[in-house]
Each structure stands twice: as structure tokens, then as C-alpha cells.
Amino acid sequence: MLSVFRIITLTLLASALAAPALAADSTRLLRFPDIHGEQVTFVYAGDIYTADTSGGVARRLTSHEGLELFPKFSPDGSQIAFSAEYNGTRQVYVMPSAGGKPTQLTWYNDVGVMPPRGGYDYRVLDWTPDGEHIMVRANRLPWGVRVGRYFLVPADGGSEAPMEIPEGGGGMFSPDGSKVVYTPIDREFRTWKRYRGGRAQDVWIYDLEQSTSQQLTDNPATDNQPVWVGEDIYFASDRDYTLNLYRYAEGEEPTAVTGHEEFDVLWPSAGPDAVVYE
């Protein structure tokens, strides 16, 4: 059974879609969570932390004055990949999930500071299921024609390589690594609410073996940040005017998993058998 976790301030909501609050309520703005087994990682005040899904004291892994974002557990949970501003530019790093010295993996100059609605360069999205590469979204074009593209970065170091998909926002590998679920349009950092225009996102699958794509959702609303858990795909959608988590199973219409009415589901991320979100 799928477990769904939500980080709201320092509150974790756990189990199969509903559970009691499990932590204190004094900390705010926990962001960009990821989950692996009984551990979650997240960003607070620009640093990376981990905590148990059952609650308790969070463990601080970084303390550099540079901003760290988008932590993602490796498939075996032993490492965390993330992006950070340590040397004047944003780059991708990896470190042990128990804490330790970060290792820099990318060396390509980033595009510099973008406007808030442009988000961040070098967004860490996922690992390949074999743990050998890290999937990132990065910009490589001038401002006037800037688009984000997916790249694979070797986890042990080496040159990054572009993926076949020409442009995209959030994305994640299928459990067997043969496909990617993604949105061709990136709009995660826009502040548009209940948008129904030409930049509304839909969820697609790209088959890496066949080099073909398939559209899964076709809705005037926003469908974004898709993740893959087992045979099912989960994504955030505001088709009911608040971003909630939806489940897509092959051959079925998407169904709502959460029913929030006041606050949106943001930045859902998945482990082998669970989804966590802001």
C-alpha cells in the first residue's frame, strides 16, 4: 500500500493517505522533500536535513553559507545528490546520506541568477535505478531562447550527457529505467494560480528504448511534478482549483489521492513505495 507523507512546517502526515501529526510546529518553510524507506530529506533555511518518517529530531547535513537545494536519495539510500552554490556558481554535488564531505560532480558554468519565476539552474530530479547517474534539469541556452533540458551526470564523476528529450520540467525514471515520466513544459516557479492557458502542463511518458513519447493527461488545468511508484504515476493537478495529488493507472482516468482545499500540494517526490510533498 502506498504511503503518502506531507511536510507542513515540521509536521509529517503519514501512512496510507491519512495519519496523526508527528512532530512539533515551531519550524517553518521545509522545502523540496524526498523520501527513501524510513528517511526523508528536505531543505530548511538553505541547508539540507534528514529526519525519520516516524518523527523526532532532524539531522543537519550541511552548514555552508551557500544555498543548497533539491536533495534526492540514491536508489539504495546511501547518498544524497543536490545542487549548491559553493564556489560562485550552482553545481551538482553528492554526499553520504549519513553526513560527510560533498563531492562536486558538475563543472559547467550555470546561467547565473534568474528571475524568481525562472527558478533555479541545475535542478536535481532523480537517479537512474542502477545508481550510476543523476538526472538533472539544466539550462544551456542564452536568455532569449532559454529552455531547460535533462542531463545525466555520472555519480562517480565524469562528463554530463544530454538526454534525448529536448525540453522538460519535473521528471522521474520508471522503476526499470526504460522510461521517463515528465512534463514538456516547466512552470513550477510561476506564481500563476488556477492557470488555464497555453502554458498549462500535461504529463507525458518518454520511452528511452523506442525514442517515442506518449501523452498521459490532456486537461486545461495544470498537471505537473509527476513521479513513478511501482506501476502507477502520481502528479499534482489543480483541475479542482487547488493542487492535489492524483494517481494515474494505465487504462484508467486519474483519481485524486488527496483532498486539500486551502493549500496546494507542492514538489511531490517519490521513493520505492511512498510519496512525500510540501
Label the predicted regions.
Residues 43-49, 63-68, 83-97, 101-122, ...:
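A flexible loop/linker signature enriched in serine peptidases of the S9 family
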Residues 24-53:
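Beta-strand-rich domains and repeat architectures in extracellular enzymes and scaffolds
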Residues 7-18:
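Bacterial N-terminal signal peptides
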Residues 34, 72, 126, 172, ...:
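Conserved beta-strand position repeated across blades of beta-propeller domains
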Residues 19-23:
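Sec/Tat signal peptide C-region and signal peptidase I cleavage site
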Residues 37-38, 76-78, 130-132, 176-178, ...:
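Short coil/turn segments that connect the beta-strands within blades of beta-propeller domains
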